[in-house]
Every structure is written in C-alpha cells, then in structure tokens.
Amino acid sequence: DMSIAENHGGLYKNLRQLRESNGTCECNLFKAMGFDYMYVNEGNDIQKLIEAFEKVKDIDHPIVVHINTLKGKGYKIAEENKEMWHWCMPFDKETGKWNISFDGESYDNLTCDFVMKKMKADKTVTAIVAAVPTCIGFTEDKRKEAGKQFIDVGIAEEHGIALASGLVKNGCKPVFATHSSFFQRTYDQISQDLCINSNPATLIVNTASVYGMDDVTHLGIYDIAMMSNIPNLVYLAPT
C-alpha cells in the first residue's frame, strides 16, 4: 500500500481492490490489458513465492504475478514507521537508533524551511517531488502544512518535470527536487519541456557528488556532466 511515502495516483485504487479481494476483484487492470494474473497474498513467505513461481515458470503466455508484502516485515520498529525506514544509516537493532548521531541543521531541513517560507509568501510557488519528499525535508507534517502547494507525483520523475513546465505556463513557480541519480530518468523532459521552451523552474539536486550515496545504482556524480550542456539550463553547485 506504499512505496516510500504515501501513494499518489489512480492506479493504486485498483491495486488496493485486488489486495482486499485476494486478487478476485472483477475490476482488474492487468486482465483489462490482456494479461493473465496471479495474486500472492503472503509475499514475505519464501515458500509461497517458490510455489507461485513454480506454477508460472513454464507458462506459454504473459502473466502478472501480483505479490503483496509488508514493508519492514520482521522488524517491528520498521513496520511501525515505514517511510523513515525506507532508507537508514547503520543502527542499533535493539533500539532502532542510528549509530551516527547528528544534532545540527541538515541541508534537507534548511532547504525545506527556505522553500516553505517562499511558499507562504507567494502562493504560486509549488514544490514537486517524485516519491522522495524527505530529500528536501518535506516530512509528513510539512506536507500537510504546504497543502495544495506540495505535489508528489510518485516514482515518475518524467511527469514531475513535465508538470513543472505546465505549471510555469500557467503562472506558477515550480521547485522540483529529487536525488541526483534520478534526474537521468527525466533528461528528455528537462531538455525539451523546460529548456527548449524557456520555462523557468528551479531543480534541486539531492545526494550529489562523491559525498552523496555511494552504492552502484545511486551514484550522484553524473548530473553535472549530463545536464550542464543543455541550452538554457544553469547548474549551480555551491557546496
């Protein structure tokens, strides 16, 4: 029922119906597209998964295996705070407290406070994120405070930038933020929707440079090379 933060968009309503009906709901978006369908309710059970995959591995037509899992399964602290535990630092498993403590101001919180201040002073300022609202400090309480001036498009960075471009055309001042690695997904929209059309928007890059995330899929070292050659785009890296 969630990916990172709460879900947004029309698809999730039908996915919920399928979960609640154990996959038997008459309204099934996958079958509507011509696929066969199998629902696995106990997706955290390895044996159940093996049984499901054994049933479909030799099938002669496309099938969607819809697997229901519990985020944080097996660790009560994570089960009770799913958004915060989507990603974490090394921690003490008994208490859930991080092994590294930090009590100063973070860039995330500083950025959120600045954007919130601008939003309160100007109702045309709109913050847009793609499923990672806390990358610029928009915790659940901040999201509620921002109201309609905060938009989470889900894991759809392409839509986030295209939406920002449309908002500009209608008099808004969009601020789009996501992690450095995720900007590669929306290169075309940045180039064609924003920059070719000279639509002014602010893009905030999180976890960039060698000081960002260091796993192979989330490296933040490519954004400047990728985007700085796009006409009408100015990349500022003050830190």
Task: Map each language-model feature to its residues.
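Mobile "lid/hinge" segments at catalytic clefts and subdomain interfaces of large enzymes
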Residues: 1-13, 29, 197, 231
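A substrate-engagement module of RecA-like helicase motors
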Residues: 8-12, 16-24
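Thiamine diphosphate
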Residues: 21-25, 35-52, 58-239
